[in-house]
């Protein structure tokens, strides 16, 4: 199959297994959920009454003081005491096989092509790290909500895009399922397309 280059009167020959396969919604959903889960920190932790540091001594005698009876200063009803059903650190990570991950990316790229959301160009960049210059180029191409994918990290492009709303720049190694579906358009250079095909096999 062929992808038409937006900035040239030519087309790029690409693999149908990467850019023309059926959309596997269940697989994409599973991989996106796993990706989001793996980003969770999961370090929240509180102490139970057993873990709070302090004396185990009865604060005052059982009878005769006129105060409510108390057996410990570490109970949940005391200030500085333990927490009932305290939250503990959890590992939220989910395992995703390489084959599944690659399959999900292929499904996403194929769906982007079908929905006309994948914009392929011969090359893309800015001469200086100027937001104004990048904004003008994107306006010329009628692109606003866009993920720009380049073969390698382009510092000028990265710095120019940093202050633009709904514009992100990634190299091929930095793309992920969530970013690909989060933006309205994905702008990819011809060289990046070749690298994506090599990466996904």
UniProtKB/Swiss-Prot annotation:
Instruction: Tell me the GO BP annotations in alphabetical order.
Output: translation
Record carries keyword RNA-binding = yes
Q: Which GO terms describe its molecular function?
A: rRNA binding; structural constituent of ribosome
Source organism, top-level taxon: Bacteria
**Region listing for Disordered, in residue ranges:** 46-71
Pfam families, sorted: Ribosomal_L4
Q: Where is the signal peptide?
A: none
What keywords would UniProt list here? Ribonucleoprotein, Ribosomal protein, RNA-binding, rRNA-binding
Asked if the record carries the keyword Ribonucleoprotein, the reply is: yes
Cross-referenced InterPro entries, in alphabetical order?
A: Ribosomal_uL4, Ribosomal_uL4-like, Ribosomal_uL4_dom_sf
* Gene Ontology CC annotation, any one: ribosome
Q: Which HAMAP family match?
A: Ribosomal_uL4_B (MF_01328_B)
Q: Which family does it belong to?
A: Belongs to the universal ribosomal protein uL4 family.
Q: What is known about what this protein does?
A: One of the primary rRNA binding proteins, this protein initially binds near the 5'-end of the 23S rRNA. It is important during the early stages of 50S assembly. It makes multiple contacts with different domains of the 23S rRNA in the assembled 50S subunit and ribosome. Forms part of the polypeptide exit tunnel.
Share what the entry says about its subunit structure, partners included. Part of the 50S ribosomal subunit.
Protein known as: Large ribosomal subunit protein uL4
What gene name is given for the protein in this entry? rplD
């Amino acid at each position: 199959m062929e992808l038409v280059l937006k900035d040239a009167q030519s087309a790029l020959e690409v693999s149908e297994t990467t850019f023309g396969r059926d959309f596997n919604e269940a697989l994409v959903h599973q991989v996106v959920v796993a990706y989001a889960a793996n980003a969770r920190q999961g370090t929240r932790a509180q102490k139970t009454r057993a873990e709070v540091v302090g004396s185990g001594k009865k604060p005052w005698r059982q009878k005769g003081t006129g105060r409510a009876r108390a057996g410990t200063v570490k109970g949940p009803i005391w200030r500085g005491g333990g927490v009932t059903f305290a939250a503990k650190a959890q590992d939220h990570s989910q395992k995703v096989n390489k084959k599944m991950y690659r399959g999900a990316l292929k499904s996403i790229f194929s769906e982007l092509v079908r929905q006309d959301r994948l914009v392929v160009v011969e090359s893309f960049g800015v001469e200086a790290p100027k937001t104004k210059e990048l904004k003008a180029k994107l306006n010329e191409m009628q692109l606003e909500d866009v993920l720009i994918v380049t073969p390698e990290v382009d510092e000028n492009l990265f710095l120019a895009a940093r202050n633009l709303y709904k514009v992100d720049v990634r190299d091929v190694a930095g793309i992920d399922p969530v970013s690909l579906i989060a933006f309205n358009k994905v702008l990819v250079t011809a060289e990046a397309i070749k690298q994506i095909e090599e990466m996904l096999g």
